[in-house]
Amino acid sequence: MNKEGLDRRINIFTDMYANIEVPENTVVEMDLGCGKGAFTTALAEKYPNRLIYAVDVMLGRLRKLCKRNLLYGVENIQLLRAEAWYLIGSALPDGSIDRLHLLCPDPWPKEKHKSNRLISSEFLRRLNNKLKDRGVFHFSTDDKDYYRLAVKIIEESGLFSRDDGQIADVVDIKTDFEERWNNQGLDVHHCAWIKSKRLFNH
């Protein structure tokens, strides 16, 4: 399939585009920053009755994931090209996501770039509003310092309770990045959090 055909299967969201319509009575998961989509595809294959949103800002990555889905006959993934802050802040309906995976985002290790890190108190407030009651936030990173800081920020938010058992079903599913990292003998650190406090009514 050519690029035009692939692009017709990708939903592009900007501040000029309508909000996402998430179906009711469906278990909905989101892979935020899905990359080439190895994790996303495996998750969708494991749970064919769930709706899986694959989100990335890079069109080339989404095209590769689209090809992968066509090759394996995966039909329960929706591809979204969107910036994470806009998606979590505006486009997603409140109380619509059962589980969100944020796996190995850019750790921005240089001091002058750390303000670009996605995990922050404001991001967590927005995420809390988009998760369903008792919804799950799954985070991972290869950067030990970022991991420790992220855990601290999430704990201090008071919005989530840690429960790593909520990702026991996906411990053997890896992103393309984690697979390469593990092959070098290096670890990726995971944690899972349940929404324990509702900031807004939905």
Q: Residue ranges of each PLM-predicted region?
A:
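A short glycine-rich, Lys/Arg-flanked "PGG" loop and its adjoining helix->strand segment in the class I
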Residues: I119-D133
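Conserved beta-strand signature within the Rossmann-like core of class I S-adenosyl-L-methionine
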Residues: R134-T141
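S-adenosyl-L-methionine
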Residues: M1-V28, A38-E45, N69-D94
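Conserved SAM/SAH-binding beta-strand->alpha-helix loop
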Residues: M58
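Conserved SAM-binding loop
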Residues: L65
